[in-house]
């Protein structure tokens, strides 16, 4: 997720903006930039750390209105051209803006604007907004006279934009103003004396003011040094409540959450939405994966998928194996990367290798990818980090648009990895004639409901917290799943081990009687994923089996399941959904269970002992 700041005051804007951007460094970024309204629109950008940007900015830069941005690449590689702010207006530049979000229809808008004479300097979706705004104000690339003011032009431009945005915009022709807009991306205004602030996060300006106004979806705002005006969707001026922020800085960078992990569990709602953005069309029943360097004929010729991953990414890959085989009818193998290199794999013609890595720098995964590429096997990387090593080595790359993940234990990156695997499997199945367009339309309808369904789970997290606290002193946990829920059982056990230091094991429920049941004793907590589907009745039998050994059963089940309560001691509910998508909901419950167990045990949740976020050694 990018960081946005804006300043309208009487002091030099550049130092204030740089200071604010530094407060947002924790979010992660690959480049940064600043625009100040001085003698004109003056923009400075740099790749890498903010200190690199500081060295580009003249010490005596004047101008008391400005915007700044830290970028986490989603469209286009990290570069000065792709860094924000983005400008429009030729010579001289008229408009400069910063943007957080994803514009889903940017390619169509870009093609149209190029046809109208606008020149693009970057690979980003954001530059489209700058030129579109210029068009609505000045009429053409070389237009000099404004037909609209900045606010009116922005409103017109936003009518053409599909996607999410938090925008801060300034204009050479309206020197005293900073204009804002928001839809599905956070934006907050800070109220000062003789100065006002804007940011994607209160952290940016907390040292200047604790009085804030939160901008809501479809609202626009105009800031000057002495005033703040906020307008609703129809352009009517509206009164907004002023909030007093009591958080300290450390709490503020976590947006009020106690830990980054809890914040990132909640961010799965927006992360999944962003990962789906621009990739699915419910109307057409289509899935668009333009980054995939495989045409339909090549997809039809695939005989095998080889997944390579480690840790949490391996659990995502295991679910992916089930999806490729069940939906697309393609044989799929999955290997732990550290093992793959040493087993002398038998290669098959028509194989696609898929490497899954959160950081794109996992040493074992990179080594496995290099091994399989030595056989001339095409490779697809699924990662969260633009410009990482794997993105430079794989033939194709699909990005999880989860934003920076600070907590060591993966949460939102796991969910977004799953989203891409679902889309790949359904895309392959459609191309290969295994699924009908009508089914795909239905699938898209259902997967787009997932963010809202996750929010329902988050709304009942106190129930999960109570359950976790009751068993925080347990020495061992058992997680059971069947079919699509088996990888989720493995992931739930790993999460508990990682952050609470409790021994936990995930099992295919049908394997209990082949050994693990010997470990059960009175009161042992057993987490059984028992959402409705083809294995539901068998899971009920497994629950009865462990209850007969006096274990304590915590079931994850659908909200409308009236049967499960007869057998489980505690039921943690998830919304009823398509069986295929249930893992996306069940895992959120297990993430919260692990989090609250670790909290009750007073563990270092964001930085658990002996673990690192990116494992760059073999």
UniProtKB/Swiss-Prot annotation:
Under Pfam families, the record lists: GATase_6, SIS
Molecular function (GO) terms for this protein are: carbohydrate derivative binding; glutamine-fructose-6-phosphate transaminase (isomerizing) activity
Domain SIS, residue spans: 295-434, 467-608
Top-level taxon of origin: Archaea
User: Which processes are annotated in GO (biological process)?
Assistant: carbohydrate metabolic process; fructose 6-phosphate metabolic process; protein N-linked glycosylation; UDP-N-acetylglucosamine metabolic process
Q: Which UniProt keywords apply?
A: Aminotransferase, Cytoplasm, Glutamine amidotransferase, Repeat, Transferase
Entry keyword Repeat? yes
Please give the chief subcellular localization of this protein.
Answer: cytoplasm
Question: Which reactions are catalysed by this chain?
Answer: D-fructose 6-phosphate + L-glutamine = D-glucosamine 6-phosphate + L-glutamate
The record's subcellular location field reads:
Cytoplasm
UniProt-annotated catalytic positions: 2, 613
- Provide the residue span(s) of the region labelled Disordered: 72-91
- E.C. number: 2.6.1.16
Q: Which residues form the Glutamine amidotransferase type-2 domain?
A: 2-226
Record-level GO cellular component terms: cytoplasm
Q: How does it assemble?
A: Homodimer.
Query: What function does the entry list?
Result: Catalyzes the first step in hexosamine metabolism, converting fructose-6P into glucosamine-6P using glutamine as a nitrogen source.
The protein's name:
Glutamine--fructose-6-phosphate aminotransferase [isomerizing]
